[in-house]
Amino acid sequence: MHDLVAARPYRSRDEEGNVRVVAEIDGSQPLWFSVSSDDEELLGGRADHVAVALLLPAMRHARDLRVGGVVTDSLLHRLNHDLQSLVRTVHPSYHSVVVTADETAPAGDAPSGVATGFSGGVDSFATLTEYASAAGVPRALRVTHLLNNNVGAHGGGGRALWRKRFDALRPVAADLGLPFIPVDSNIEEHYPQMGFMQTVTFRNAAVVHLLGGGIGRSYHASEGTYRNVRMPPTHGDIGLAGAMTFPLLSTPALTVESTSSGMSRIERTLALVGGPYARYLDVCIDADPDRTTNCSRCWKCMRTMLTLEIAGSLDEFVPGVFIRAPYERRRTQYYAELLSSSEPNDIELVEFGSRNGWRWGAIARGRATARRAKHWAREVARALR
């Protein structure tokens, strides 16, 4: 198959006056990212973000990647070596490719800006607490900018849901006295049928490389505690390997790192109880842009609500953040899913409940046994093929 060729990025203005960084793609639609004109000073002049953004599409379709403009030499080296090995461990059907650039250059000096993504979820609040609102954080580590990226996490709700979620979180940023930067993009259109969780690390890393003119350190909340850091299952959530992936996506001018692995998901959730920002918690995966609360029935809502209920703190979040009725209707089925799960965060939640005398019920245990048997049968059948 022919190479995936991206031209040197250039800047333009969209109809709202935002600054759009565009890389034309041979035979395809351009790749673009945009920020407000007030944030233009953060934009870097290199094409590192293009190389990071397009590596996975190139590997999936077995197309060597040619990037116009300047790419940092150390990043280009890792894109051709260890990063591809890591990606192919998670996605064995992806191919080794050659990544080249029109020009390479050593990294310059690291800018002083420190950014973290802020979505209003449990994990992003944990990072915010540790590196923005806590006392005694060294200046070199203290967050100076909050980011909210539109890189495909909002499902069918798309740009409308992204904007609504961003606007809802503005008061938190204002209270902390931090600039809150929305970064729009069409990167999702370059990842057809590739899955968001399967590619999330590279999507968000592309954004911080885009902002390399002002950001020299970027935090990305881990998905669990250190004991759960591991290579994901085949075609699984690549974010589970964040502690391994992010260092390979760094350069001497930009440190990209995974944070908050010292806390379990349960500890991060309970840290919000009684806090000033609890009412802003948004964990929901429902893509309806018109929703006014968390849906209280998706797996993320169920996990968070059960954690709070076991701790005796759910009432603090109802009805402003969650709604009790949908949760209670689905609770027994969710218990069965938890009890039969091998996912580390689910196992931790079951252990937390059992330590606190939580009663799962005979019906849920029976359904869990049936689910495990069905899963075992599928695995045996797959092994015999």
Model region roles, listed by residue range:
Residues 25-44:
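N-terminal, positively charged, Ser/Thr/Ala/Gly-biased leader segments
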Residues 40-55:
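Extended acidic/polar, glycine-enriched regions
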